[in-house]
Amino acid sequence: MKKGFFFDMDGVLFDSLPNHARAWEIVMARHGLHFTKEDCYRQEGCTSRDVILNAYKQQMPDRQVSLEEVEAFYHEKGEKFVELGGAHPMPGAYEVLQAIRSMPDTQIWLVTGSAQLTLLDQLNHAFPGIFVRERMITAFECPHGKPRPEPYLKAWESSGLPKEECCVIENAPLGLQAARAAGLFTVIVNTVPLGYEDFAPWKPDAFLPDMRALLDYLPKLR
């Protein structure tokens, strides 16, 4: 029986990736960098710092980028994301969270590469009564983000549960890679325009089309 549920945020709890992808595309172009929506989907799960540094490393390898520049870049991208409409709760997400909360002795965790200061307020507004700050692993707690296993390892260690009682809910190949490297059971909710072949190297334990399908799948985890 699964008791610890570790949720990614963008593309799982929030239908935010189309606006994230467009914001990255626009702001990268301002800085002379080529970045497509597909690049965003494939790097989803990375910290924004890693996305920015990876783009410079691949396209302008001789360019030295300061931390101050990275912060300004991230702020600029965040403003564009809000301007484009930001994020909305993923259909079916609240029903999944409520169903898990009704199961005995369960823990619900957030594991995200985001570093938004207003994150808890957003979660409480969209999913009241579900998340607490003590069960959130963000870029502040774990700067070495996905695809490294550290974010999910930190959530697992903090939960105090055996690994076999934990379940990761992800939507991104890099998130799946991180979860599998951490040795955790992982369910993919494929809310991005990618195919199973993009996830196959890391062998997800379940591959579902959306959060409503996850709601139907939950009894198998009890």
Q: Model regions: which residues?
A:
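Asp-based, Mg2+/Mn2+-dependent phosphohydrolase catalytic module
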Residues: 1-3, 98, 115-222
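Hydrophobic alpha-helical core bundles mediating ligand binding, dimerization, or RNAP-core interactions
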Residues: 24, 28, 48-53, 74-81, ...
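Glycine-centered short loops/turns at secondary-structure junctions
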Residues: 104-105, 183
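Alpha-helical substrate-recognition element adjacent to the catalytic core
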Residues: 27-60, 83
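Metal-dependent phosphoesterase signature
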Residues: 56-98, 104, 161
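Active-site neighborhood of HAD-like aspartate-dependent phosphohydrolases
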Residues: 1-42
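Short helix-capping segments at alpha-helix termini
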Residues: 30-33, 60-65, 103-104, 127-132, ...
